[in-house]
Amino acid sequence: MRDAILFLALLGVIPFIFKRPVVGALAYACVGLMNPHRLTYGPAYDFPFAMVLCCVTLFSLLVSREKKKIPMSGAVLVLLTFVTWMSVTALFAQEPVIAWLEWNRVMKTMLMIVITIMTVRTVNDVKALAVVVALSLGFWGFKGGIFTVLSGGHSRVLGPGGSYISDNNTLALAMVTALPLLVFLITLAPTKWLKRTAIALALLTAIAAIGSYSRGAMLGGASMLFFLWLKSRSKVTTGIALILVAPLILFAMPEQWSGRMASIDNYQEDESAMGRINAWHFAVNVANALPQGGGFGVF
C-alpha cells in the first residue's frame, strides 16, 4: 500500500514539474530529506525516486522558457568553489576507487542543489522550499519525539536506513538544523491551530534531538537556541519559555542519558570522543602532507 501511494505520488507530481520546474526542486527536497521510500517494504524501498525527479526537473528546466541562469552571490560562489575543490581532491585521492564512488554520489546531490538555486526565484518559492524542508525533517522530528516520550528516553532515536541521516548523530544534526525552519514555520501559520501545531512539531523535534543521545546535538542545540533567543523580537517571552521548558525536558530524561552527556567532562576516557579527536589530528596531518587533500574515503 505504501509503495503504491509513493509511485502514484511520483506520477502525479510529474505534470506539475513540466509546468513549473521549481515543483521538481520541492519534490526532490522532500524525497531527499524525508526519505519516504525507506518506510516501505516493497519495490519502492530501493526505487531511485530522487534520480527520477532530478532527471525530470532538469529536462523541464531545459525546455522551459524560464531564464537558465545561476544567480551569483557570495554563498553560491563559495558552494561552487567547494564543489570544484571536491573534484580536485578526488583526482589526487589516496583511495581512488572509494573516492570516485562517493564523488559520483555527492555530485548528483550538488547538481540538484544548483538546479534548485536556478528554479527558486520568488519570495513564495523560497517560503515553499522552507516549508518543505521543515516538514520533511519535521516528520522525523515528530516520529522521533513521540518515540522518545513513549520510551521514556531509554532508547536512541535513529533516522531512516541507507540515508544521510541514518545514525543518531546525523539525525540529531538534521533535527537541530530543522528547528530554526520550524520556528519560521510558526510565523507563517495563518491560523491559531496551525500555529499551535507548528509549535508542537518544533517541540517534538527538539525532543527527538535530545533522544538521539548525541552529545554534539546537545552542544549544537544549546548554541542554536541561544542564537534564536538573540534574534527573537520578544526576548523576555522567549527566554522565559526556554527557561521553563528546557529543564523539564532534560530532567525527564533517564540517568543513562545524563551520564552520556556528563561524559563530555571526561572525554579522555570515552572511546567515541577520543576517536573523533584522533580523526581531527589525522585530518590536520593529511592537510599538512597533502595540500590538495586526501579525497573521499581517506579516513
Spans of model-derived segments:
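Transmembrane signal-anchor hairpin modules in multi-pass inner-membrane enzymes, especially those
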Residues: M1-V88, V97-L101, R121-V131, I186-R196, ...
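Short aromatic-rich membrane-water interface segments that cap or initiate transmembrane helices
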Residues: H37-P43, G159-L171, S272-G275
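Alpha-helical transmembrane segments of multi-pass inner-membrane proteins
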Residues: L8-I17, T57, L80-L91, K108-I115, ...
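Conserved catalytic core of Hanks-type protein kinase domains
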Residues: I17, L33, V106, T119, ...
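Transmembrane helix boundary and interhelical junction motifs in multipass membrane proteins
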Residues: V23, R215, L219, G294-F296
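Membrane-interface loop/short-helix elements at transmembrane-helix boundaries
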Residues: R156, S163, E255-F299
